[in-house]
Amino acid sequence: MDYSEIMVRHGELSTKGKNRMRFINKLKNNIQDVLAPFPAITVRSDRDRTHVSLNGTDYQPVVEALKLVFGVQALSPVYKLEKSVPLLVTAVQDIMTSLYRDGLTFKIATKRSDHAFELDSRELNSLLGGAVFEVLPNIQAQMKHPDVTLKVEIRDEAAYISYEEIKGAGGLPVGTSGKGMLMLSGGIDSPVAGYLALKRGLDIEVVHFASPPYTSPGALAKAQDLTRRLTRFGGNIQFIEVPFTEIQEEIKNKAPEAYLMTLTRRFMMRITDAIREQRKGLVIVNGESLGQVASQTLESMQAINAVTSTPIIRPVVTMDKLEIIEMAQAIDTFDISIQPFEDCCTIFAPDRPKTNPKLGNAEKYEERFDIDGLVQRAVSGIVVTEITPEIVNDEVENLIDALL
């Protein structure tokens, strides 16, 4: 027997009361985005489950993709069949025969939500357990902690059989907590910050600053690859490339070296906030970790934050670098992040950046710039690209590798 579908159990959505169906519909849409590389698949949701019908698609890559989607508490590959006792008996016998090995223990766990069905849960447990013993007389039944728990659900539309329960990513469906702008440099920290923001349901749009010719096309591709990795957790992400060369050259030519980083970050914050307002975002997200580098002392954060009243979310602010690296490795962004391409934060980095910059000094140095004009030109020059999941590209690359 081949699996018919993947049954997805919802996570925190069960606590959302009147908004529950809005959350479930958003999860359904996110699942459809993530599974877009599998064109035969169809997705249907109800209040308790989301059903991913395989329609002949190999279930394993689908499970691997679904495991990463935020809002999924657990999932099970299932066999779907008509609500017929003879069909159930045959299916249970076939499944247990395929799983059997010496010493295997099992139990049947039936749940009947269709109370019009001819047998109740207790009767089904007894009948189906007996059917297993008919074909496997040496198998052992065990009610506590068996090797296999064969779950049978009798629902209004069909019967479902499963024996695996795979842990999902948990969290909230991406997009149910509003929209935020993720400042993504290409380093280790900001993709992890984006991942954690996605987990709490934030729909992120990535803002990346590019300063050609000082930053290379490789640096831009790296940032887009990191964004593509993040699409696995909730679907497509808008990638916003910001032209930043003019501003960085102005700062380099007109500001004291010790304040280069502070002024650069203040301009980045202004521009990100202007893009947020233009695109109806609610917050800014970044990868700052307290005390990690010169621009991430409290004094620096205060001087940089002063350009906006928009809330700034810093998901990794209290994490050690090793903790951030471990999470980056777990979400598969680390190897991309350490590719040796310079970003806007490193190309003009001073040898001795100011670790306790004074807000008054920063504002005094900025009097040398046409702030509004520089910000306006940067915002008007943005390039927006929709980044989609990478599964199709990976499959094509694997096919090419196999042919070669």
From Swiss-Prot:
<dbReference type="Pfam" id="PF22025">
    <property type="entry name" value="ThiI_fer"/>
</dbReference>
<feature type="binding site">
    <location>
        <position position="287"/>
    </location>
    <ligand>
        <name>ATP</name>
    </ligand>
</feature>
<keyword id="KW-0963">Cytoplasm</keyword>
<dbReference type="GO" id="GO:0009229">
    <property type="term" value="P:thiamine diphosphate biosynthetic process"/>
</dbReference>
<dbReference type="Pfam" id="PF02926">
    <property type="entry name" value="THUMP"/>
</dbReference>
<dbReference type="GO" id="GO:0052837">
    <property type="term" value="P:thiazole biosynthetic process"/>
</dbReference>
<keyword id="KW-0808">Transferase</keyword>
<dbReference type="InterPro" id="IPR050102">
    <property type="entry name" value="tRNA_sulfurtransferase_ThiI"/>
</dbReference>
<dbReference type="InterPro" id="IPR020536">
    <property type="entry name" value="ThiI_AANH"/>
</dbReference>
<dbReference type="GO" id="GO:0000049">
    <property type="term" value="F:tRNA binding"/>
</dbReference>
<feature type="domain" description="THUMP">
    <location>
        <begin position="60"/>
        <end position="165"/>
    </location>
</feature>
<protein>
    <recommendedName>
        <fullName>Probable tRNA sulfurtransferase</fullName>
        <ecNumber>2.8.1.4</ecNumber>
    </recommendedName>
</protein>
<dbReference type="GO" id="GO:0009228">
    <property type="term" value="P:thiamine biosynthetic process"/>
</dbReference>
<keyword id="KW-0547">Nucleotide-binding</keyword>
<dbReference type="GO" id="GO:0002937">
    <property type="term" value="P:tRNA 4-thiouridine biosynthesis"/>
</dbReference>
<dbReference type="InterPro" id="IPR049962">
    <property type="entry name" value="THUMP_ThiI"/>
</dbReference>
<comment type="similarity">
    <text>Belongs to the ThiI family.</text>
</comment>
<comment type="function">
    <text>Catalyzes the ATP-dependent transfer of a sulfur to tRNA to produce 4-thiouridine in position 8 of tRNAs, which functions as a near-UV photosensor. Also catalyzes the transfer of sulfur to the sulfur carrier protein ThiS, forming ThiS-thiocarboxylate. This is a step in the synthesis of thiazole, in the thiamine biosynthesis pathway. The sulfur is donated as persulfide by IscS.</text>
</comment>
<dbReference type="GO" id="GO:0004810">
    <property type="term" value="F:CCA tRNA nucleotidyltransferase activity"/>
</dbReference>
<feature type="binding site">
    <location>
        <begin position="208"/>
        <end position="209"/>
    </location>
    <ligand>
        <name>ATP</name>
    </ligand>
</feature>
<keyword id="KW-0067">ATP-binding</keyword>
<keyword id="KW-0820">tRNA-binding</keyword>
<keyword id="KW-0694">RNA-binding</keyword>
<feature type="binding site">
    <location>
        <position position="296"/>
    </location>
    <ligand>
        <name>ATP</name>
    </ligand>
</feature>
<dbReference type="GO" id="GO:0140741">
    <property type="term" value="F:tRNA-uracil-4 sulfurtransferase activity"/>
</dbReference>
<dbReference type="InterPro" id="IPR004114">
    <property type="entry name" value="THUMP_dom"/>
</dbReference>
<dbReference type="InterPro" id="IPR049961">
    <property type="entry name" value="ThiI_N"/>
</dbReference>
<dbReference type="InterPro" id="IPR003720">
    <property type="entry name" value="tRNA_STrfase"/>
</dbReference>
<dbReference type="GO" id="GO:0005524">
    <property type="term" value="F:ATP binding"/>
</dbReference>
<feature type="binding site">
    <location>
        <begin position="183"/>
        <end position="184"/>
    </location>
    <ligand>
        <name>ATP</name>
    </ligand>
</feature>
<keyword id="KW-0784">Thiamine biosynthesis</keyword>
<dbReference type="GO" id="GO:0005829">
    <property type="term" value="C:cytosol"/>
</dbReference>
<feature type="binding site">
    <location>
        <position position="265"/>
    </location>
    <ligand>
        <name>ATP</name>
    </ligand>
</feature>
<comment type="pathway">
    <text>Cofactor biosynthesis; thiamine diphosphate biosynthesis.</text>
</comment>
<dbReference type="Pfam" id="PF02568">
    <property type="entry name" value="ThiI"/>
</dbReference>
<dbReference type="InterPro" id="IPR054173">
    <property type="entry name" value="ThiI_fer"/>
</dbReference>
<dbReference type="InterPro" id="IPR014729">
    <property type="entry name" value="Rossmann-like_a/b/a_fold"/>
</dbReference>
